[in-house]
Amino acid sequence: MARIAGIDLPRGKRSDIALSYIYGVGRVTALKVLDAVGINWSRSIDDLSAEELNEVRKELEKNYKVEGELRREVSANIKRLMDIGCYRGLRHRKGLPVHGQRTHTNARTRKGPRKGAVGKKK
């Protein structure tokens, strides 16, 4: 099983699809990496040699932030927004939508399950 950036790539999938299983690598980035290394995107991960996988690994490490490094950067950016007390940071802190979406109705994904009205006690 091929392993890149700490992720086991799925067997039997095309190489561009398999690379997109890595956090921070989508289809476009996967195609760019494969093109830079000179591997056809339609080849299966199983068909790639250890040397080719090593070239892909080196290309990702050299030119792209993926997995843990990218996750740390994103969380540090959000923490910085919260520390400086800007509007976006306050929205993150309160767990509300950040990009100006409506919250009177909707926004259930960010706000969590509904808090039901407290019923009359008998």
UniProtKB/Swiss-Prot annotation:
Chain positions covered by the region annotation Disordered: 95-122
- Give the top-rank taxon of the lineage listed in the UniProt record for this protein: Bacteria
PROSITE patterns from the entry? Answer: RIBOSOMAL_S13_1, RIBOSOMAL_S13_2
| Presence of keyword Repeat | no
UniProt KW keywords: Ribonucleoprotein, Ribosomal protein, RNA-binding, rRNA-binding, tRNA-binding
Family classification: Belongs to the universal ribosomal protein uS13 family.
Q: Give the protein's function.
A: Located at the top of the head of the 30S subunit, it contacts several helices of the 16S rRNA. In the 70S ribosome it contacts the 23S rRNA (bridge B1a) and protein L5 of the 50S subunit (bridge B1b), connecting the 2 subunits; these bridges are implicated in subunit movement. Contacts the tRNAs in the A and P-sites.
Assembly mode: Part of the 30S ribosomal subunit. Forms a loose heterodimer with protein S19. Forms two bridges to the 50S subunit in the 70S ribosome.
The protein here is known as Small ribosomal subunit protein uS13
Organism of this sequence: Lawsonia intracellularis (strain PHE/MN1-00)
Classification from the root reads: Bacteria, Pseudomonadati, Thermodesulfobacteriota, Desulfovibrionia, Desulfovibrionales
**Gene name for this UniProt entry:** rpsM
